[in-house]
């Protein structure tokens, strides 16, 4: 599971870089609601990545120990997305729904880019 932890921390670092860029955008541009929405969505997306990594670790340990396998936490990730939607709908003067949804998708985009980057890097080393 060390490889999973390394991948997780690499992806967290990328997401934190994006959050820093969004924070700069919030502070220095007139698009405050857009960047605040991106910050909200990406922050919740970061929680989703942490939750997914933790559940995958527990899942792997249960399989290795031949114990009963639990779910991977889809319901908890859906609840986090619903929480973001409730916040956006409660405070429409501060948030927009589209940038929040884009922020929620950020972790999955980072995972895909990270996968292809490391696949390309490993293929380059083996060639």
UniProtKB/Swiss-Prot annotation:
Name of the protein this chain belongs to: ATP synthase protein I
Described function: A possible function for this protein is to guide the assembly of the membrane sector of the ATPase enzyme complex.
Membrane-spanning ranges: 11-31, 34-54, 72-92, 97-117
Cited InterPro entries: ATP_synth_I, ATP_synth_I_Bacilli
GO cellular component terms, semicolon-separated: plasma membrane; proton-transporting ATP synthase complex
Protein's cellular compartments: Cell membrane
Gene name in the database record: atpI
Similarity comment: Belongs to the bacterial AtpI family.
Keywords linked to the UniProt accession: Cell membrane, CF(0), Hydrogen ion transport, Ion transport, Membrane, Transmembrane, Transmembrane helix, Transport
